[in-house]
């Protein structure tokens, strides 16, 4: 009888172990970079002058994109797509925070950035590194940018990194989003993070 009880207990424990391990792994259209040891933190001023950190947005999925307001194509396209992502998430869209970090603090003043963000979504947050902070920040986030001269000293453009980073509601870096990914695919990925 003792052996029967012992075997029954072992079978129950084995079944529980299998059930506990049966949580389906998440599958993303974005590049899964869970566990990456870069792009982990920042402390930058927003357009109101308040210092913001990634931890300020705990409980939300966060998408971070680097750009500049005079960008002719990549930046407005990406921000327009983030509006669509938020809409595609429906009621969960309120748990998505888009953060735009300028690569052009010389021209992207708080006033300029505030108006720029409001033209897409007033809930988007713009952050402004100082010219001294920008090189280390770009290194930490593996963001390439390079100034290309224009006809006047202030009419330059920037070649820059066009991807985005996605953090889960616990503040962990999870995904790299390539430029041009469809808003519906990105919304599906973010939806998984919000439900996980």
Give the positions of each predicted feature.
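Short active-site neighborhood of thiol/selenol oxidoreductases, capturing the structured segment around
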Residues: 55-76, 82
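Bacterial signal peptide processing site
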Residues: 22-24
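Conserved helix-turn-beta segment immediately C-terminal to the redox Cys motif
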Residues: 60-61, 77-101
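Short, internal strand/loop/helix patches
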Residues: 114-161
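A short beta-strand-turn-helix
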Residues: 42-62
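Thiol-based oxidoreductase modules, predominantly thioredoxin-like and allied folds used
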Residues: 95-108, 124-132
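Thiol-/selenol-based redox modules, centered on thioredoxin-like
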Residues: 151-196
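C-terminal motif of bacterial Sec signal peptides marking the signal peptidase cleavage site
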Residues: 18-20
């Amino acid at each position: 009888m003792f052996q029967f009880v012992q075997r029954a207990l072992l079978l129950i424990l084995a079944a529980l172990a299998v059930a506990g391990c049966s949580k389906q792994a998440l599958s993303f259209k974005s590049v899964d970079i869970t566990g990456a040891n870069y792009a982990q933190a920042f402390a930058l001023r927003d357009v109101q002058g308040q210092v913001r950190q990634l931890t300020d947005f705990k409980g939300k999925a966060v998408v971070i994109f680097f750009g500049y307001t005079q960008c002719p194509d990549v930046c407005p396209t990406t921000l327009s797509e983030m509006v669509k992502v938020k809409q595609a998430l429906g009621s969960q869209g309120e748990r998505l925070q888009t953060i735009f970090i300028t690569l052009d603090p010389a021209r992207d003043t708080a006033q300029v950035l505030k108006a720029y963000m409001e033209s897409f979504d007033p809930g988007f947050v713009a952050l402004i590194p100082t010219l001294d902070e920008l090189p280390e920040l770009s290194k930490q986030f593996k963001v390439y940018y390079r100034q290309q001269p224009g006809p006047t000293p202030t009419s330059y453009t920037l070649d820059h990194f066009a991807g985005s980073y996605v953090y889960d509601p616990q503040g962990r870096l999870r995904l790299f989003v390539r430029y041009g990914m469809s808003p519906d695919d990105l919304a599906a990925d973010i939806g998984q993070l919000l439900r996980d």
